[in-house]
Amino acid sequence: MAGVSLYGGQDLPMLDKLTIESFEPHVGTSFWLHTENRKIELRLTRAAKVMESEAARLARTPFSLYFLAPVLLPQQIYRLTHDGFAESLDVFLVQIAGDAGGFTYEAVFT
């Protein structure tokens, strides 16, 4: 996502610049999770605002992203890439559900 200039043009890390609006156009598209020896496709299924009542005191409105993956992964920080973002994203993913259709992971941004 080249040219992101939020927060008055301050030089912030990529993740600190992103808002829910950065991800909403990408719901339904594929992100790629990179491990040492494989690349796994994740589908962004939903982007949702959280803690609306406390958002006024924060630099951005907190939000969660929900991804569907074909494999079970331990909760940890993963490197994600997407064609719509110029830089890779290091995101903490937690598995919140799973069934025959795959495993759902959540990433929370505050």
Positions of predicted regions on the chain:
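A generic structural signal for short beta-strands and their flanking turns/coil linkers
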Residues: V27-T29, R38-I40, A59-F63, P74-Q76, ...
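Short, Lys/Arg-enriched N-terminal segments with co-localized hydrophobic residues
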Residues: A2-P13
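Conserved hydrophobic positions within beta-strands
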Residues: L44-R46, L93
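Short coil-to-beta-strand transition motifs
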Residues: L33-R43, H82-L89
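Short, compact, well-ordered microdomains
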Residues: I77-T110
